[in-house]
A protein has these predicted regions:
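Short, charge-rich amphipathic segments
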Residues: 1-9, 58-68, 162-164
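Generic detection of long, well-ordered alpha-helical segments
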Residues: 13, 17, 63-66, 120
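Structural motif corresponding to the C-terminal cap of alpha-helices
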Residues: 27, 77-80, 112
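Short beta-strand segments enriched in hydrophobic/aromatic residues
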Residues: 27, 43-44, 51, 108-110, ...
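A solvent-exposed, acidic/Ser-Thr-rich amphipathic alpha-helical stretch
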Residues: 36-107
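A beta-strand edge to alpha-helix "cap/lid" segment located at domain peripheries
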Residues: 3-6, 82-169
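Short, low-complexity N-terminal intrinsically disordered segments enriched in polar/charged residues
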Residues: 1-29, 33-42
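Binding-site signature for planar aromatic cofactors or substrates
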Residues: 11-22, 41-44, 53, 71, ...
Length: 169
């Protein structure tokens, strides 16, 4: 692989990583009043978003095309909201670029507090294909498959004071 090819591959990987990072940041704050335009700008017009496996296929289903994907996300923007706290941590990244397409995998850890008082920790395997259109990498096919989900006895965001060392020692 030439230096130019290697540089192009690294640049593509960085842009794909940035696209996924932006997707997760927007999902972290998705709630009433959220503008879905920025989130939808990360998807190709003919994109697919789907849940896989026994749990997520039933819970999330499959959405084809930006209009269907937008409608699915719109459910999270209605009052009174769904999440009080929602954080997406990605790890175990793997990205493979081939020309103007790429495939990528991540593990997702997601602690969530819900408006209805419940809290949960979920782990999922994300498999995402990307396509480069007009110099921009876009999500072509997003899949999420549950590895585990665990209800939590207490909220993640506890209002108790944080323990710190005594400064008088």
């Amino acid at each position: 692989m030439s230096h130019a090819e290697l540089l192009a591959q690294w640049s593509a990987e960085k842009q794909i990583r940035r696209c996924m990072h932006q997707y997760m940041q927007l999902c972290d704050v998705l709630g009433p009043g959220s503008d879905l335009d920025e989130l939808m700008s990360l998807f190709a017009a003919d994109a697919t978003w789907e849940g896989l496996g026994k749990r997520y296929k039933k819970t999330f289903g499959r959405y084809v095309g930006c209009a269907a994907i937008r409608q699915m996300f719109a459910g999270y923007t209605r009052e009174p909201g769904h999440f009080l706290l929602n954080i997406h941590f990605l790890g175990n990244e793997e990205i493979h670029v081939t020309g103007d397409t790429a495939s990528a995998n991540w593990l997702l850890m997601q602690p969530s507090d819900f408006v209805d008082g419940r809290s949960q920790l979920s782990c999922a395997r994300l498999s995402v294909t990307f396509v480069q259109r007009h110099e921009k990498w876009l999500i072509q096919h997003f899949t999420t498959e549950n590895i585990f989900s665990r209800p939590m006895a207490a909220r993640w965001d506890n209002t108790a004071e944080l323990p710190v060392p005594d400064s008088n020692d």
